[in-house]
Amino acid sequence: MSTSQTVHDVIIIGSGPAGYTAAIYAARAQLKPLVFEGTQFGGALMTTTEVENYPGFREGITGPELMDQMREQALRFRADLRMEDVDAVQLEGPVKTVVVGDETHQARAVILAMGAAARHLGVPGEEALTGMGVSTCATCDGFFFRDQDIVVVGGGDSAMEEATFLTRFARSVTLIHRRDEFRASKIMLERARANEKITFLTNTEITQIEGDPKVTGVRLRDTVTGEESKLDVTGVFVAIGHDPRSELVRGQVELDDEGYVKVQGRTTYTSLDGVFAAGDLVDHTYRQAITAAGSGCAASIDAERWLAEQD
């Protein structure tokens, strides 16, 4: 194990809109950020085929193209970007340590931007058809399913909200839930049930998503009788929750009951001095590229001001 003698002003963990925006702002502020992007840079947007709601791109842009442009912009300002995974951190005290392989790096401040991962069904066809009819974001992709028949999978508030939202575009929405009881709040469930475009299939699970090159249908199984059936649809929206990627910092910074990093008020300050968090790692609600980028900006500004106060 080798330890770098350089103490960086700031280390950023994670890429995606939050990490790259933090890197751009930190680099322009002459903080010379060291950024550990992970072995697959760009975050969740790397699997998003079309982004039409990010300001500045009138004709839209693909997720990978948007991330590549953000990455190139960070490089332009000489952020030190490294496609490596962080193995461990020690965030207490005036100098924080970040372990990557057999190297230990040090910094006065750390920005956490590891994001959150959408939960998946884990059925055949899901991974291959992601971006080709399978989605985890109705706000991002609903527009592309105008006048089509689609399904939403889930039983919580997010599933009800996404199903209701998708009725603005889709011809029909079938909400599939593996139980006959829902975790959703009463008001969200009633709102979905009152929508004439939404049909409920309870005690039902998807066993396979079909299509080549795009989704054409799903295979279903009744969880009570075992009876199998098929439903012709062109879209599958998976709304069974997200898992924040906070395991790296568990036991060091304060997390909420769902594992999201807690920040102070409207800032990006965490429970530890000199540690800031941004993007989907802290965001239960919006989970959009533009909001992640905004919080990445805020984290960098918070870190810059905090560092100035320490001098």
Curated annotation (Swiss-Prot):
Its cofactor is FAD. Transmembrane segments: none annotated. GO terms for molecular function: thioredoxin-disulfide reductase (NADPH) activity. NADP(+) binds at residues 158, 177, 183, 240, 260, 287. Its EC number is 1.8.1.9. It catalyses: [thioredoxin]-dithiol + NADP(+) = [thioredoxin]-disulfide + NADPH + H(+). It is found in: Cytoplasm. One of its GO terms (biological process) is removal of superoxide radicals. Binds 1 FAD per subunit. GO terms for cellular component: cytoplasm. Homodimer. Belongs to the class-II pyridine nucleotide-disulfide oxidoreductase family. The active site is a redox-active disulfide bond. This is Thioredoxin reductase. It comes from Mycolicibacterium smegmatis (Mycobacterium smegmatis). The gene is trxB.
